[in-house]
């Protein structure tokens, strides 16, 4: 009887260990997915920033066509240009409120 109980306990411990291991592996996968979902911050060159600022000084809202052309000229994605303009408008508004 005692031997049987030991096997059951051992079996439970083994199962718990397996479950914990599976949970741990699942958490590692989730952490890797979360890390991969965040993009690296774009480091704009001085030239790109000068061109973006110059364009912003003329117009704060680019049409899609203008955004595509600017992105191509600066070797950026359309999304990078769009986000830069969004962020720049926020800074512009903050500075002009005070």
UniProtKB/Swiss-Prot annotation:
Keyword Phosphoprotein in record: no
Q: Which GO terms describe its molecular function?
A: DNA binding; DNA-binding transcription factor activity, RNA polymerase II-specific
Record's Pfam families? Homeodomain
Q: Which InterPro entries does the record cross-reference, listed alphabetically?
A: HD, HD_metazoa, Homeobox_CS, Homeobox_TF, Homeodomain-like_sf
DNA-binding region(s), residue ranges: 37-96
Its predominant location is nucleus
Q: Which domain of life is it from?
A: Eukaryota
What GO cellular-component annotations does this UniProt entry give?
nucleus
* Matches recorded under Gene3D superfamilies: Homeodomain-like (1.10.10.60)
Its keywords, alphabetically, are:
DNA-binding, Homeobox, Nucleus
**Family matches, as CDD domains:** homeodomain
**Where in or outside the cell is it found?**
Nucleus
What is this protein's record name? Homeobox protein SMOX-4
What is the species listed in this Swiss-Prot or TrEMBL entry?
Answer: Schistosoma mansoni
The gene name reads SMOX-4
């Amino acid at each position: 009887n005692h031997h049987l109980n030991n096997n059951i306990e051992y079996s439970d411990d083994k199962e718990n260990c397996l479950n914990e291991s599976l949970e741990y592996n699942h958490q590692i996968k989730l952490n890797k997915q979360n890390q991969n979902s965040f993009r690296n911050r774009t480091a704009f060159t001085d030239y790109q920033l000068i061109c973006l600022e110059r364009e912003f000084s003329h117009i704060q809202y680019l049409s899609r066509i203008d955004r595509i052309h600017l992105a191509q000229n600066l070797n950026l994605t359309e999304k990078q240009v769009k986000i830069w303009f969004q962020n720049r408008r926020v800074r512009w508004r903050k500075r002009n409120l005070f």
